[in-house]
Amino acid sequence: MASTRSIELEHFEERDKRPRPGSRRGAPSSSGGSSSSGPKGNGLIPSPAHSAHCSFYRTRTLQALSSEKKAKKARFYRNGDRYFKGLVFAISSDRFRSFDALLIELTRSLSDNVNLPQGVRTIYTIDGSRKVTSLDELLEGESYVCASNEPFRKVDYTKNINPNWSVNIKGGTSRALAAASSVKSEVKESKDFIKPKLVTVIRSGVKPRKAVRILLNKKTAHSFEQVLTDITEAIKLDSGVVKRLCTLDGKQVTCLQDFFGDDDVFIACGPEKFRYAQDDFVLDHSECRVLKSSYSRSSAVKYSGSKSPGPSRRSKSPASVNGTPSSQLSTPKSTKSSSSSPTSPGSFRGLKQISAHGRSSSNVNGGPELDRCISPEGVNGNRCSESSTLLEKYKIGKVIGDGNFAVVKECIDRSTGKEFALKIIDKAKCCGKEHLIENEVSILRRVKHPNIIMLVEEMETATELFLVMELVKGGDLFDAITSSTKYTERDGSAMVYNLANALRYLHGLSIVHRDIKPENLLVCEYPDGTKSLKLGDFGLATVVEGPLYTVCGTPTYVAPEIIAETGYGLKVDIWAAGVITYILLCGFPPFRSENNLQEDLFDQILAGKLEFPAPYWDNITDSAKELISQMLQVNVEARCTAGQILSHPWVSDDASQENNMQAEVTGKLKQHFNNALPKQNSTTTGVSVIMNTALDKEGQIFCSKHCQDSGRPGMEPISPVPPSVEEIPVPGEAVPAPTPPESPTPHPPPAAPGGERAGTWRRHRD
């Protein structure tokens, strides 16, 4: 027991003995005893208190450990780059095990072909007084400059930076705070002129030149130098930073306010000397194409004529940023006179035409933003309009339809809030066939009827044609049947009334539509819950002044005299209306090919053998069958007129029944017509009708079965309105398929709160 206690005492005595700096391990004991005698000589195991872990906790506090583990935030700049805002790194022993690891990460983040191409090799303090050689020398909240092998360059790196991320800033960073504070106060005083604006910056040099778009607002435009920095990062000049910006007028941008003036396009120059040549201020075709997608909408368009160093004059209006940029700028060439006649292909009634040097920032892929004229003087000395009536009156929205030759955008009347559709036709795509578009527009300009989709307003520029059209959201004729819960013979009678009413009006103007089909009959829903049909798509319409011979239309609805090529007139529309009436009551067409062959279909149409098969027609009134028989007469003279349809008892009186035949008719429609299948959006149906142009109708001009064996009697006479579709040569191949093309469709129409009975059909009286 005594021996054990002696050993313990000696053990603690040994602990109290501190090894001297000069002492060596393994030195002989002062007692001279052997290594096996006594506890001091036989290598006793130290107390657990001397283990590595216990020593750690004895010598380093939790606070010291936490301080070592905490990441230090520091900002790093590029040597000599005054426009670089700096990059903040959180530096900790866990993230960077060595100083070299930090250099590698900085190289990855800061180095490129222009800046630090040899990577980060050296780190200086912000004032360049010394080099940093270890992680321990980096201090919290400080800023440092990264370089390769070059000497430190004295630049005020912190001029445009407000390091709000730093904590307990001391020493050199006080200058950064002072500089940032002065910039902040300067911006605060002069922010009134900053409005959201999208500008285009083109890099100087050999064409083609890169162009970028930058959004400027109160959050992105803090100072002139900061905007230059953003432009430098975006434009990436080969020579490095952007030193100066010039407008297309040749005026140098010297302050932030210059960005928010009348100019939208700027030329970016580097350290090299800028060449003030005429070519620098002229945008070539490829640059115009880039600019065409720059601006989405504009609240107003102004015109000005400031002079530029070159011979041309340029001035542009600020762009309004309220959506995805999609419209275009262009520099079209035109020789048209602004004094053209209203009905000529060169101009449209009631609209001001932009001059030959004028420019429209709209096209079929973008929103209409009518920019200023490049030249304040138009053709023949006429000056451009001071503002765009179209943009002042309407608010232009997103694209809702995109076709082969036109796009359709949302269009809202600013004064009434009423929705319309803006149809934008690209003239470049209509080259050589402008007369077809003009013919269609000239007819739309003439017609004004409650059962016809109306052309509200039109405008023409040198590159685009803008048509504000009535927007019908209720889907087409098939949608009205398939989406309803109840469909009766009386509903079909009202639909035929609306169609006949439109045809009587058109035929009174000697206009034949030639493409009457369910897809072109749109359902207009009124606030009181009532509905009516509106006829659209006048791409094949023309004025009748004599027999027509072009074989065109949709095969299922084409009249026999069109196929026979004996000459036809207005009553081909009555035949098509008769086919539609037949379909409305049973769900399938009166003439159809079992093998889906067009030649068989045409043979049946020419024969004109009309049947009302049981059981589909057992519950249909005789009055309806009588009217259909009168409408589908092969003999044109015996065929009834639109006025006679309106006066027929089945249409004008209550001869129709109220029996619900929705399920039967819908089933047959889905069986025989692809476009009768359920669709997702009723608005897109109306948009697709508006989106079509006369150029889309070329596929509907085909040869009849007699086209190969019989010569044509002659070309159709050209009406006084611009040339019609008749001038298109008849192709050699027939279109496949009697089935009409697919078109999008709607949800069921909403119930009406009052007025007439919800869901009933209006009968407009002339």
From Swiss-Prot:
Residues 1-45, 300-378, 707-766 are annotated as: Disordered. It holds the Pfam family Pkinase. It catalyses: L-seryl-[protein] + ATP = O-phospho-L-seryl-[protein] + ADP + H(+); L-threonyl-[protein] + ATP = O-phospho-L-threonyl-[protein] + ADP + H(+). The modification Phosphoserine is found at residues 362, 647. Residues 7-19 have a biased composition (Basic and acidic residues). One of its GO terms (cellular component) is cytoskeleton. Gene3D superfamilies: Doublecortin domain, Phosphorylase Kinase, domain 1, Transferase(Phosphotransferase) domain 1. Residues 72-158, 197-280 form the Doublecortin domain. It is found in: Cytoplasm, Cytoskeleton. Its main location: cytoplasm. It comes from the Eukaryota. Keywords: ATP-binding, Cytoplasm, Cytoskeleton, Kinase, Nucleotide-binding, Phosphoprotein, Repeat, Serine/threonine-protein kinase, Transferase. One of its GO terms (molecular function) is protein serine/threonine kinase activity. Residues 394-651 form the Protein kinase domain. The modification Phosphothreonine is found at residues 61, 666. Changing residue 212 to M: Found in a patient with hereditary motor and sensory neuropathy; uncertain significance. Its EC number is 2.7.11.1. ATP binds at residues 400-408, 423. Protein kinase with a significantly reduced C(a2+)/CAM affinity and dependence compared to other members of the CaMK family. May play a role in the down-regulation of CRE-dependent gene activation probably by phosphorylation of the CREB coactivator CRTC2/TORC2 and the resulting retention of TORC2 in the cytoplasm. The doublecortin domains are involved in the colocalization with microtubules. Binds to and stabilizes microtubules. Interacts with MAPK8IP1/JIP-1, MAPK8IP2/JIP-2, MAPK9/JNK2, PPP1R9B/NEURABIN-2 and actin. Belongs to the protein kinase superfamily. CAMK Ser/Thr protein kinase family. CaMK subfamily. This is Serine/threonine-protein kinase DCLK2. The lineage of its organism: Eukaryota, Metazoa, Chordata, Craniata, Vertebrata. The gene is DCLK2.
